[in-house]
């Protein structure tokens, strides 16, 4: 007699459990970071939608309902609606450029009453679906077919370019995670080498100056020309010359964008990370910073590295075991701007200490490992590529967010998955992960 199928037993409860623990950490951290805001209203009104914690609790409730709905739906619907969701995301990204409101210099939000919706967060999810749908099509071969490869790059590049126009550098960088997906699916290793080389060129140009980069490039080219001097014309020589000319043009482009496109505070953040202020013994540029909680406080002019300095102080002061829940001085007195969003990790570091931050790191590593391992086991090409996409997106968010809180990455504004305050990001991350859980649950019922 055939055994009756139990859908609950097919879900990856390991992934769901990690998600739940991270969500719980996020709730406690947001409560701690917005404690003064809560106390300013009333402790009995802890779920008041006028507070950050109250709003986040509402979004957590929405996410729980959404998790149940996503797990109950037929997994085929995600394949069917992949291109539709991508099209809707593109329309929203265009609409927000025309009708969105300006927040911190970025025109990337729709204002709906006291709430805000950020289409870029959902565009990542939609791009993951669309890329998975395209690359799982019949006879699609990005390794040997250039047209297929450029189509995949276009699917990634269109929303990325629209997000760039919004001024949201952080979300733009997240789209780079799809390059790892292409590489995993057989694209040339150049897709990993080229970004690394361009990053090195950019760092040399910004840290030591465009003239230094051009001199290094010219000396390298002269050395290679000397090496080829006694040989007959070689096509490789022409290729080498083209590469070096390209490096020079790229370096000039980086310098032009840095000087004429980036704002003063963005240049100051990059300079601080590159150590230029320490070397030149100059104070960084200043910017307007308003404390998170005290809305009536006067604007204070602080050094642009204030966020990073205070974040590192908070993490370092936590020590091994932390100061205890609601006992963090940096947290309670709002020394760190944006502490409920971009700098939420320093709240955990101050109040929970080394053990708390280590636990968060371990949870993220386990989540990424389990996602990649789950993706490798998929029978469906769509599910496999989607799993790689989810892992890539979460990795970029995790790496950049924690990197900027400890001062090794410029402050570009990017949330910590499942922990940072924000309804759009929490909904998008939840959709990303839970759809993968559903696809994996149906893995054994997919024909090879």
Show where each model-derived region lies:
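A conserved mid-to-late transmembrane alpha helix and its immediate loop/hinge
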Residues: 308, 312, 321, 325-374
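Hydrophobic alpha-helical transmembrane segments of multi-pass inner membrane proteins, especially
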Residues: 20, 36-38, 42-300, 346-406, ...
């Amino acid at each position: 007699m055939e055994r009756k199928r139990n859908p609950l037993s097919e879900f990856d409860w390991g992934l769901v459990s990690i998600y739940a623990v991270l969500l719980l950490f996020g709730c406690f951290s947001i409560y701690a970071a917005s404690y003064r805001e809560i106390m300013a209203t009333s402790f009995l009104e802890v779920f008041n939608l006028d507070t950050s914690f109250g709003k986040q609790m509402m979004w957590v409730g929405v996410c729980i309902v959404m998790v149940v709905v996503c797990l109950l739906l037929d997994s085929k619907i995600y394949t069917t609606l992949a291109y539709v969701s991508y099209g809707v995301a593109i329309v929203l990204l265009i609409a927000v450029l025309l009708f969105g409101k300006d927040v911190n210099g970025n025109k990337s939000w729709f204002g709906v009453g006291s709430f805000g919706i950020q289409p870029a967060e959902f565009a990542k999810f939609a791009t993951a679906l669309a890329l998975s749908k395209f690359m799982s099509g019949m006879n699609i071969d990005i390794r040997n077919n250039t047209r297929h490869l450029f189509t995949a790059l276009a699917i990634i590049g269109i929303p990325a370019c629209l997000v760039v126009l919004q001024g949201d550098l952080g979300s733009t960088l997240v789209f780079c995670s799809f390059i790892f997906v292409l590489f995993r699916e057989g694209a040339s290793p150049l897709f990993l080498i080229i970004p690394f080389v361009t990053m090195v060129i950019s760092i040399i140009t910004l840290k030591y100056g465009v003239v230094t980069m051009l001199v290094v490039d010219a000396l390298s080219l002269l050395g290679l020309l000397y090496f080829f001097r006694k040989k007959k014309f070689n096509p490789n020589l022409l290729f080498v010359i083209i590469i070096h000319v390209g490096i020079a043009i790229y370096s000039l482009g980086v310098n032009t964008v840095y000087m004429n496109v980036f704002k003063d505070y963005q240049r100051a953040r990059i300079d601080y990370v590159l150590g230029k202020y320490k070397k030149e013994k100059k104070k960084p540029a200043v910017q307007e910073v308003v404390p998170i909680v005290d809305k009536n406080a006067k604007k204070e002019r602080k050094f642009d590295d204030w966020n990073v300095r205070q974040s590192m102080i908070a993490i370092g002061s936590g020590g091994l075991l932390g100061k205890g829940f609601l006992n963090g001085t940096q947290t309670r007195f709002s020394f760190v701007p944006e502490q409920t969003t971009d700098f939420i990790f320093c709240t955990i570091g101050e109040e929970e200490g080394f053990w708390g931050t280590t636990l968060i790191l371990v949870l993220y590593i386990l989540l990424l490992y389990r996602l990649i391992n789950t993706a490798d086991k998929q029978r469906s090409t769509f599910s496999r590529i989607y799993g790689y996409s989810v892992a890539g997106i979460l990795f970029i968010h995790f790496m950049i967010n924690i990197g900027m809180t400890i001062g090794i990455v410029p402050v570009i504004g990017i949330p910590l998955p499942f922990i940072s305050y924000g309804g759009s990001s929490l909904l998008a991350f939840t959709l990303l992960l839970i759809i993968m859980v559903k696809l994996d649950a149906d893995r054994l019922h997919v024909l090879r």
